[in-house]
Amino acid sequence: MTLIRRVAFLSLHTSPMEQPGSGDAGGMNVYVRALASALAASGVEVEIFTRSTSSGQPAVEHPDPGVCVHNVISGPPRKLPKEELPELLHSMVAEIERIRQRQPHGRYDLIHSHYWVSGVAGLELSRLWGVPLVHTMHTMAKVKNLLLQSGEKPEPRRREDGELRIVDGATRLIANTPAEAAELVSHYNADFDHIDVAPPGVDLTVFTPAFRPRSRAQLGVPAGKFHLLFAGRIQRLKGPQVLVKAAALLRSRRPDIDLQVTILGALSGAKDFDLKSLISAAGMDDVVTHHPPVNAPELAGWFRSADVVVMPSYSESFGLVALEAQACGTPVVATRVGGLSRAIFDGRTGLLVDGHKAADWADVLEALYDDPATRGDMGRAAALHAQGFGWQRTAAITLESYHAAVDQYIDSHRIPVGHSP
């Protein structure tokens, strides 16, 4: 078995150093940094390449032992819409190669790219360096376009074509769930034998259960409130509008419920999505509070303060928020889509809802309010369920995929045994 010593991560459109829940930063940012750290703890050096978005950024950052982040200078020193990044691909590839040439070691055993822009760059770097490419989609254009919401632009054909090239050219693909692996096969004609399933993890040292009344007191959530929490980017695809409408309906039919809804996150995507106006139109200004995204320890506190975490997403490759909330001992109500069906044990650690009708969501939330004993049982089961999703497990499965990729690459390129690719 070839020893994997050094891996190049490509996360060009968003940095793992960014705060999740704003702009293009979300679960993938958490995934990239946490996986890199877990791999490093297993003895694999990880160097992450991401596009620099500020003239004040250092060239290299060291967030964790064995992990470094290269801020690649390409294009203007500011954040750009994802749609503009393909124009910078050749520039980014050239700059990454210049960085590699300046490194004392000068080589990587493998490339692991994240999201389609990085995957297209990874194809070129794989050819240039003579090493295998492993790719994780995180989201897919064809799947997103099937679930397109009113007012949202479809993913461009250029992205679909890029993803098809990646599926055809990558040595191996890593999916978050069996459902995602099936989507790769059905929508992109991927070879099932070249796909590995590695569920994301959760930081079990940060996201832990705690005494709920204490968490509420620390955040100013009154003891008698039925507290519903949404955490994520503010966009139609994540469904905060579904929660607002369901909460308004619940309030109208059950005025005896002392309701509080907290939304954590920042606007992402369509600029015409006005959450504040939606809240006002629903008559929920006195019930719904909106806060900017917070760091992981603070987020854990918010999860512990909630009676229920609500995820009315239209699409999720996995749904890290669901796992993090459960690790804190809080049940999750989510849409029965994508990876959420795997992240949540329906009926045991939370509930899955079919569709996005406000009445259906209000029914489920009302039933949980009326049954605090079941909420408590679900919370305890949720914390136990999440224990099976540590990042070291994800890293171990990913490392197996890397070894398979190297063996496959050596075999397909007829590299003599004993020589690294």
Swiss-Prot record:
Record-listed Mg(2+) binding positions: F303, R304, A306, T330
Assigned EC number: 2.4.1.250
Top enzyme category: transferase
Biological process annotations from GO: mycothiol biosynthetic process
InterPro entries, per the entry: Glyco_trans_1, Glyco_trans_4-like_N, Glycosyltransferase_grp1, Mycothiol_biosynthesis_MshA
Residues where 1D-myo-inositol 3-phosphate binds: H13, D24, A25, G26, G27, M28, N29, K82, Y115, T139, R159
The keyword Magnesium is annotated on this UniProt entry: yes
Function: Catalyzes the transfer of a N-acetyl-glucosamine moiety to 1D-myo-inositol 3-phosphate to produce 1D-myo-inositol 2-acetamido-2-deoxy-glucopyranoside 3-phosphate in the mycothiol biosynthesis pathway.
Homology family: Belongs to the glycosyltransferase group 1 family. MshA subfamily.
Subunit structure: Homodimer.
Name recorded for this polypeptide: D-inositol 3-phosphate glycosyltransferase
